[in-house]
């Protein structure tokens, strides 16, 4: 293909020179649709990481491959790797432990509880932008060091699992006892397009408002950092001010003060930072590097560029006298020295012990010693009052520190894995932890097909409406987040705080529905969980609504959900799952929302792992079924609500209707008859986007066709069933789907 110049005209436009041009739009040549219409709704996130980019094939089962792996052999190879220093990137102190810990930490540390995105679960550190973030400088070397191990074991261990395991083995190889390890993180094969911030430059910080209020859903203080600036806020070496940043960013990663102190102190017991010289001598990141660099970035012209001359960031700090051995030296140095501000050889602000003795080893010259040094953010653990109490307790009680770090490290590296049902391997801890959102195991015989049919009949005869049943089932299941695998219908946490009190769930109406379903369950001859009844009720209502529309449909039902208790539910941890907006229910909350309603719809659809067509058919179906929050009539484009027709699409695309903004209510539109101007419908931005956005309109047209009534119902039922079962990892693991399914 001929290379186009940067000022080339739009693809396909006449060319004065008559030269042939490549018909495929490339990023560097010519403009893309996004360049011409930057404000257009982007639904491309719904179609990423599909089978089209997966080289493993549709039949590949990573869980099966991992469980066939000789994990101890991998661990043995990783132990050997730790001290096998390579000339092209020599190991500090003869041990790669510190580097591997940093790699694992930074893989997991992108996790943010606000939307569950980031984290170690998909191996995204291999791809841009994470592979080229300033805070991830030289972690490309860590992954290259791991390549022989990955190459040896191939598809039996993912990069995502291997990076976390390498961090664990690094800790174990340096004398620390970890809490455990679970495999099960499947790799993805293309970068995830996430919102990492509004800035257009590395280390920019346009993400604040008011009194340093960090905007949601972000979890780091600057573009390209994992957490905080180690030199202090915007380079201001103030440990107390830095503590505020630390607390906020770690909180957004679901860590409390004790876990935060344990992680910082535990991680900084090992290894060092690298600021040997002028950072301007460091070359481009991996994504910006030359072809011949083969994906390695940050090539430095300072000295040898590695080893004693390595430059990763700015500070040059070693925290411990034994940087390759677990100890309490971090706290000993922190509390038993007074600190004075200084600069690293790279010019970064850091701290050194006043009148300190040279007791810290040099990473490459055993004859040399250094004075103890600390980062501004390390001193926060001493000078912030709350952190100081915890730090001093850890200093005086090393066993408490070790236990706290082991638990916090496990949480850090497993927080985005979801329920224990996803955990694989012989090193999974036996102890159940509250942050894992535990659900009791099945303790009773499950209902069969006849039972399910009988229960459906009782539910439909209970007086509960189609709207009641569909809304409740959707509210329960749609809390699922494919990002960190949390939420979903299993556990029936919709009956517990905080979900039972969320505005979007209409608490008073919800309580009435749940009470009736619980009564039906108690009066039935067999034990059945409320979680199963909620889903079964939604299924029954949809099947009836479809039948009323003249279409027979059966939604597969797989029993086995259980009911969690309030004691098994961390209220604060579940609070971020509350929808600020839910376009499927035409709900826009009163809380601050940084997205337009239609953008929030796509965001939620992506968390639900829906495709564009699935999102489209669900919105259209839920509207006519009356699932809107508070019974809103916006988008209910039908004369027969409660009947599963394709009326939403037919009436939205009807050219006899014209649309205009409604007076007095932002984001609401009136659909009026073109001839008489009589009001026919009202709709929101979410409703009208399916007629305005060209791709969504194309999907909508499919369901508005005269002969598509049956297709609409079948597609809606399939998408509905998908959402109801997104969290059924227990079924996926045991392979019981077909065996237990009620058709």
From Swiss-Prot:
Gene3D superfamilies: 1.10.520.10, Peroxidase, domain 2. It catalyses: H2O2 + AH2 = A + 2 H2O; 2 H2O2 = O2 + 2 H2O. The record marks 102 as: Transition state stabilizer. One of its GO terms (cellular component) is cytosol. There is a cross-link at residues 227-253 (Tryptophyl-tyrosyl-methioninium (Tyr-Met) (with W-105)). Its cofactor is heme b. InterPro entries: Catalase_peroxidase, Haem_peroxidase, Haem_peroxidase_sf, Peroxidases_AS, Peroxidases_heam-ligand_BS. Its EC number is 1.11.1.21. The active site is at residue 106. One of its GO terms (molecular function) is heme binding. It holds the Pfam family peroxidase. It is an enzyme of class 1 (oxidoreductase). Residues 1-22 are annotated as: Disordered. GO terms for biological process: cellular response to hydrogen peroxide; hydrogen peroxide catabolic process. Binds 1 heme b (iron(II)-protoporphyrin IX) group per dimer. It comes from the Bacteria. Bifunctional enzyme with both catalase and broad-spectrum peroxidase activity. Belongs to the peroxidase family. Peroxidase/catalase subfamily. Homodimer or homotetramer. HAMAP family: Catal_peroxid (MF_01961). This is Catalase-peroxidase.
